[in-house]
């Protein structure tokens, strides 16, 4: 049946039996396609019936359907004519793992950052009203996990006050990555577990209407006290006191029930909450049985067993996890904070060892930072483990709540740099630029597992201001020994390679973090051409160490190589430091051009950006040649462009 679905219109005349068959076929399709490419399997298995109902009740794209976070939009893509493209899911030039405005008019929003859908919906509803399109409904699908984010409640406050026809579908599966936590989750759990009072009321209506003479009068009396009965039976006052109509809870795997609830909500003409209870990983035993995250996201797997087909090597995240536990055993002041991602950020083992010292604050990065500030004020040393891309959400709190007070908060930034297959909104290429403007901030970028452990320990010893460590996604690789260390403490830099005997000190090549191995490969290529290169790992990359300046003074050219946007990164910081020190040494930066990148593998993206060792060596050769010929600075730049 799925092959016959070219768009939402093809769903309108299907029978209940056909819809059930289609739902089963969609699940089978998802399991086999995502098993081959990797992706967000569990969330999509849980929204099959919900997505079918949405596209039968609402007229997309006339009625925008906005999926918060967007990782649960695979079924939406299939029903809007893209099922035939799933072989290319998350591959270069293929189907995005999130909604994509360039793919389809049915996709309105493509950022994968959570808790934003309701604000988009509020703005769209205002725009439709102002432009006279009052017959358009706006639908926002938001998970119970995303409702732990404060932005959702700011939007709910505005939506409720407006009275505009926004339908908010709460996809309640009790989880984000991990089980949802907090007061909102407790309210939703209570609603899920209570008897369905709407069913009880309906039975009462039917019985009263059947009574002779007094039936209609008794029914009216009952209807008049309905609100009081609802208030005593369940805590949906959480929504109704805001001025939002509440419909539910509805079995999210009963397509007809969901459809009826959505049609009911559509008819109100004002803001409505439709509470849909789903099961993440529904219909696939390996996902349903996965206690950790119900296969929220997976790599390539065996579709029968759900087991990974490739065993990953030692990873950066696991290395951090083990190191943090080791330090925490020695120091009771070390605590950890996660924003609803204890598993992906490596904090689950920490929580198992020290359950009273791990705080999951929900999808609330801003609160996480200020709560960490409070913990630090109280004598703790908090470690906030977060994906680099989500650090952006807490900039004001880092600046004004942590740094202004010179508090010892350590931020551990996982998935820094190019992450690849999840696309533009997951690349962690902004953190160095953001943190570089924060007074008193020290940032480390370990090149290997040994340095991660060392630099984490150094960060935990800092008691007069914030620190951050950044590392990429994936395997950590072999340790890279240093020839020597110049300087001490956080100012110490590791020399990884020196010019060959008889070569000049032509280039100081600064390899930042995970780019250190590439810097060494570049140096070998340059040595073959007779160019003398000193390779250093600055370890603590911001602020720029005096040891870097001392080394720079002995070379003809400084080149920085980093997995960050070039604007405001380490290269910018080194150039500024050289100017302040009045060192007349030219500096060139190699990094990521400041733009949004489509999904592809990390290797493919780096190759496209000419960030391979061969490409970088070629560029440096040109720069050295231009300097050696005495060409004016303007001509050098023209040559490099």
UniProtKB/Swiss-Prot annotation:
Pfam families found in the cross-reference section: DXP_synthase_N, Transket_pyr, Transketolase_C
Reactions performed catalytically: D-glyceraldehyde 3-phosphate + pyruvate + H(+) = 1-deoxy-D-xylulose 5-phosphate + CO2
Protein name according to UniProt: 1-deoxy-D-xylulose-5-phosphate synthase
Sorted UniProt keywords: Isoprene biosynthesis, Magnesium, Metal-binding, Thiamine biosynthesis, Thiamine pyrophosphate, Transferase
Family: Belongs to the transketolase family. DXPS subfamily.
SMART domains: Transket_pyr
Stored InterPro entries: Dxylulose-5-P_synthase, THDP-binding, Transketo_C/PFOR_II, Transketolase-like_Pyr-bd, Transketolase_BS, Transketolase_C, Transketolase_CS
Example GO BP: 1-deoxy-D-xylulose 5-phosphate biosynthetic process
Pathway(s) of this molecule: Metabolic intermediate biosynthesis; 1-deoxy-D-xylulose 5-phosphate biosynthesis; 1-deoxy-D-xylulose 5-phosphate from D-glyceraldehyde 3-phosphate and pyruvate: step 1/1
Subunit organization: Homodimer.
Residues reported in the UniProt entry to bind Mg(2+): 144, 173
Cofactor info, note text: Binds 1 Mg(2+) ion per subunit.
Organism annotation: Mycolicibacterium paratuberculosis (strain ATCC BAA-968 / K-10) (Mycobacterium paratuberculosis)
GO terms for cellular component: cytosol
Annotated coiled-coil segments of the chain: none
Residue positions binding thiamine diphosphate: 71, 112-114, 145-146, 173, 284, 365
Cofactor(s) recorded in Swiss-Prot or TrEMBL: Mg(2+); thiamine diphosphate
């Amino acid at each position: 049946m799925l092959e016959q679905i070219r768009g939402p219109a093809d769903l309108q005349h299907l029978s209940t039996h056909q819809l059930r068959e289609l739902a089963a076929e969609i699940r089978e399709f998802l399991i086999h396609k995502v098993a081959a490419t990797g992706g967000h399997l569990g969330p999509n298995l849980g929204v099959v019936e919900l997505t079918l109902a949405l596209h039968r009740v609402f007229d997309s794209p006339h009625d925008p359907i906005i999926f918060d976070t967007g990782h649960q939009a695979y079924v939406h893509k299939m029903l809007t004519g893209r099922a035939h493209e799933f072989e290319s899911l998350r591959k270069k030039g293929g189907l995005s793992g999130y909604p994509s405005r360039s793919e389809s008019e049915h996709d309105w929003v493509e950022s994968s950052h959570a808790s934003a859908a309701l604000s988009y919906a509020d703005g769209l509803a205002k725009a439709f009203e102002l432009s006279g399109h009052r017959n358009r409904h706006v639908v926002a699908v938001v998970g119970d996990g995303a409702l732990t984010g404060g932005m959702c409640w700011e939007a709910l406050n505005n939506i409720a006050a407006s009275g505009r026809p926004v339908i908010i579908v709460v996809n309640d599966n009790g989880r984000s990555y991990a089980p949802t936590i907090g007061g909102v989750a407790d309210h939703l759990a209570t609603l899920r577990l209570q008897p369905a009072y709407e069913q009880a009321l309906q039975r009462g209506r039917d019985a009263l209407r059947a009574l002779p003479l007094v039936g209609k009068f008794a029914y009216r009396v009952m209807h008049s006290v309905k609100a009081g009965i609802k208030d005593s039976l369940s805590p949906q006052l959480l929504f109704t006191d805001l001025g939002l109509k509440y419909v539910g809870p509805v079995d999210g795997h009963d397509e007809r029930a969901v459809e009826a609830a959505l049609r009911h909500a559509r008819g109100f003409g004002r803001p409505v909450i439709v509470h849909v209870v789903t099961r993440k990983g529904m219909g696939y035993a390996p996902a349903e049985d996965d206690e950790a995250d119900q296969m929220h996201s997976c790599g390539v797997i065996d579709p029968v067993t759900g087991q990974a087909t490739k065993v990953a090597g030692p990873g950066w995240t696991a290395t951090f996890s083990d190191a943090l536990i080791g330090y925490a055993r020695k120091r009771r002041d070390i605590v950890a904070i996660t924003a609803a991602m204890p598993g992906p950020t490596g904090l689950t083992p920490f929580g198992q060892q020290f359950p009273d010292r791990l705080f999951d604050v929900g999808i609330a990065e801003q609160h996480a930072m200020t709560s960490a500030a409070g913990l630090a004020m109280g004598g703790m040393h908090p470690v906030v483990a977060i994906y680099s891309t989500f650090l952006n959400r807490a900039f004001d709190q880092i600046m004004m709540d942590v740094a202004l007070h010179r508090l010892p908060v350590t931020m551990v930034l996982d998935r820094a740099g190019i992450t690849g297959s999840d696309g533009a909104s997951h690349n962690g290429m902004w953190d160095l630029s953001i943190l570089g403007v924060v007074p008193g901030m020290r940032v480390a970028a370990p090149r290997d597992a040994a340095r991660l452990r060392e630099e984490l320990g150094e960060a935990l010893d800092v008691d007069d201001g914030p620190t951050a460590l950044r590392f990429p996604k994936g395997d950590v690789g072999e340790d890279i020994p240093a020839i020597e260390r110049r300087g001490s403490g956080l100012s110490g830099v590791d020399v990884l390679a020196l010019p060959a005997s008889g070569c000049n000190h032509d280039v100081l090549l600064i390899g930042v973090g995970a780019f250190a191995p590439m810097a060494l490969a570049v140096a070998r290529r340059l040595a073959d051409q007779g160019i003398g290169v000193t390779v250093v790992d600055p370890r603590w990359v911001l602020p720029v160490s005096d040891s870097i300046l001392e080394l720079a003074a002995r070379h003809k050219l400084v080149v920085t190589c980093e997995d960050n946007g070039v604007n405001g990164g380490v290269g910018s910081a080194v150039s500024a430091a050289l100017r302040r020190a009045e060192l007349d040494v030219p500096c060139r930066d190699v990094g990521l051009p400041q733009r949004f990148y489509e999904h592809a593998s990390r290797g493919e993206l780096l190759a496209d950006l000419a960030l391979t060792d061969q490409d970088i060596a070629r560029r440096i050769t040109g720069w050295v040649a231009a300097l050696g010929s005495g060409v004016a600075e303007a001509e050098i730049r023209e040559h490099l462009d």
